[in-house]
From Swiss-Prot:
ATP binds at residues 506, 530-541. This is Iron-sulfur clusters transporter ATM1, mitochondrial. Gene3D superfamilies: ABC transporter type 1, transmembrane domain, P-loop containing nucleotide triphosphate hydrolases. Keywords: ATP-binding, Membrane, Mitochondrion, Mitochondrion inner membrane, Nucleotide-binding, Transit peptide, Translocase, Transmembrane, Transmembrane helix, Transport. Performs an essential function in the generation of cytoplasmic iron-sulfur proteins by mediating the ATP-dependent export of Fe/S cluster precursors synthesized by NFS1 and other mitochondrial proteins. Hydrolyzes ATP. Binds glutathione and may function by transporting a glutathione-conjugated iron-sulfur compound. Glutathione binds at residues 342-346, 405-408, 455.
Amino acid sequence: MRVAIRRLPWQATDARHRTIGLVSTNRLPSRIQPRSISSTSIAALVYHSRNSLRTNIFDIAATPSSRYGSSQRFYQHMAADRDGDHVPKHQAKMLPGSASDKIIAAASPASKSASSPAQKKQPDGDDPLNLNSREKTVKEQRLVDWAIIKKLIQYVWPKGDFGTKQRVVLALALLIGGKLLNVQVPFFFKTIVDRLNDVVNAPLDMSNPNTVWVVAGSAVLGYGLARVGAAAFSELRNAVFANVAQRSIRRVAKSVFTHLLALDLGWHLTRQTGGLTRAIDRGTKGISFLLTSIVFHIVPTALEISMVCGILSYKCGPSFAAVTAITMAAYAWFTIRTTSWRTRFRKEANAADNRAATTSVDSLLNYEAVKYFNNEKHEIAKYDAALADYEKSSIKVATSLAALNSGQNAIFSTSLTVMMLLAAQGVTNGTMTVGDLVMVNQLVFQLSLPLNFLGTVYRELRQSLVDMETMFNLENVNVAVKEDKNAPPLKVSGGEIRFENVTFGYHPDRPIFRNISFTVPAGYKTAFVGPSGCGKSTIFRLLFRFYEPQSGKIYIDGQDITKVSLESLRRHIGVVPQDTPLFNDDIRHNIRYGRLDASDEDVEKAARAAKVDQIVLNLPEGYSTKVGERGLMISGGEKQRLAVARLLLKNPSVLFFDEATSALDSYTETELMRNIHATLLADKKTAIFVAHRLRTISDSDFIIVLQGGGVKEQGTHDQLMDSKGLYWDLWQAQSTVGVGHGAGANEHLQDLERDQNSSTTPM
C-alpha cells in the first residue's frame, strides 16, 4: 500500500531522544548488535562444527558434487540465507573453487524472478566462463576459435587507425622480403659446391686460383648477405609489429576491465579474485602469443613451404615437391590431432592452477579467520590438493609432449632420408649435381626449424585460444543493470526518494520486498529499522542500482532512476557501508577517493569533520600512513571514520549511513554524529540511516520500521513509542537487557525473529 509521509521540522520533539549514548552498548543483546558477530563468522562457526564431523577434509574443496564447492562459497551462501541481503542464490551456483570448474565461473544472468524482466537465465551447465561445462564438438570449437581470431583482427586492423594499418602492412612486407632472402641461402650453397667441384666443365678457367677465389668468394659473400638480410628483415618486422601487438593487448585488456566494472554487484560477489585475475592475465598473454605466432611463425612457415615446394618442383622434379608436400601434410595432421588430444590435459592443469591460486588468495585474504579457528592445516591441505591435481595434469602434459615430439621427429627424419636418397640417385644418374643435393638438404633442413617451432606454436596457439576464450567470455556476461542510451542526468532539487510497489528478492524463492511503498522526505533525517534480513541495506542497493527490482518503480525528486544516467545517479548518492572498502594506499588517498580532484585542504577539512585528524596526530607519517590491504592495519572504528570522511568529501545530495558508527566508542560516535548532523542541517541534505542500535537514530525526523517485506509502521520516535508496536518491542528489548530482564528480553527477541521468519516464508 502507499504510505503518506508528512513533512517534519528538523528537530526532535524530546531532547532526551537527541542524546547519543543514552543506552550503553554493552547492555544491548547480541542479536540486536549486528556487528557483534558477522554473518561470515556465524557461517564459519556452523561450517567449523560441521567440518569437525567429516572424515575427509577435502570434501567441500575437492568434491565435484559438493553442494558449495569452497568454504568461501559456503560462507556466502550461509550469509545470504541468514540475512537475506547478500549473494543471489542463482548467481552463487558455481565458483572456481569446485573441482568441476576449469577456469573461472561466470554469473549466470538472473532469472526473471530475481532480476530485471529483460534478463534471461543462462541454462545450468552452460556457464560462459566454464569452458568444460559442456564439451564442444570439433566443429563448434573451430567456430569459437575463428570467432576469437575475427574479434582480435578488429583490434589489429582497427577502423580509422591509419598508423596501425601502416605498421601491419610494413610488417608483412618485411616478412615476405625476409623469406625471399632466406630461400636464396641454399642456392648460394649449391653455386659454391658446383663451382668448386666442377673445374673441368666450368665456363670460367677454374684452374686459375684467382678465378676460383672470385667465383667462390662471390657466392660466399652472397650467402652471407642473404643470411644477414633475412635476419635484419626479421628483426625489423619484430620491431614494427611490436607496437601493433602491445596496443592491441592494451585495448583488449581495457575493454574487458571496463566490462567487469559495468557488471552488477551480484556477479562480483560470486567471483574469486585469484581465479579471475589469473584468467585475465593468461588471456592477455594469449593475445600476445597469438599475434606473434600468426605473424612470425604460421604465415612465414606457410609462405616458406610454398616457395620450397615450388623451387623443388621446378629445379629437381615433381617427386621432390610431392615428398615435401606429403611430409608437411603428415606433420601438420599428426601435430593437430595429437595437440587436440593434449588440450584437455592443459585445461586440467589450468583448472588446478586456478584452484591453487584462488585457495591461496582466499586463505591469505582471510588470514584472521584461518587463525581464529586453527584451520592452517585445512587451508594447507586444500592448497596441496590443488597442487597435487596440477602435478598430475602437468605430468600428463609432459609425457604427451614427449610422444608428440617423437612422432614429429620420426616424420621429418623419414622425409629427409627419402629426399636424400632421391637426390643421391639423381647425382648417380647425372640428372643432378652435388650442389643440387646440398641445395635439397639445405632447403629441407631450412624447413625443420620453422616446422619444429610450428609444432610448439600450434600447441601454444591452442592454449592461447583457450585462455582468450575465457577472457573474451567475460565480455559476454550480460550487464544486468543497464542505462538508456542518451539518458539524461539526474537533477536533484531536494532529494525526495519514493518507492512505489517495489518487489525484489536476491533468491527467486525468497522475496525481500513485496510491493513495498514509502517516501523519504527531502532534506530530513530518515531512519530504517527492523529485524535482521528485513531489507534495510537492500534499500540502498536498489537505490544505487546495484540490482534491479522485479517490479515497481523508484523515484528521486520525481525522476525514475532507471531513466537517468548511472553516472549522475551515483554521483548524487553517497554511502558509508557496513564493511568499509579501503585501498592499500595512504590515508590521504583513501579520503581523496571520494573526490579525486580535491585539494589537500579539502581532504584535511573532511578528515577533521570525521574525527580522522585524531588518528593522524598519533601516526608518525600522518596522512601518508599506509592502511594496508583492505585497511587491515587500522581498527574497524578508524576505517569507519575514513569512510565518513570520504563521504563528506564527496558531498552528495543523498547520504546513506549503513551501520556507519557501529565500530566506534560512544564518545567518538557522539562527536562524529554531532558533526554529521551539523552538515545535514547546514546543507539541508537527505540523510538515511540504517541501524540496529536504536539509540543512534532516535533523534531522526522520521523512522520507518520494516518487517515481512513491507512497512510495518512509521513515524517519529515518540509516535512509535506511543503506538507500542514493533519499534517499541525492539526498544524495550535493547533497554532491558543487562539490567535484570535479560531472559525476558531474549524470549521477546525470539518471538520477533519467529514473526520475521514466518513473514518472509514464500507464499
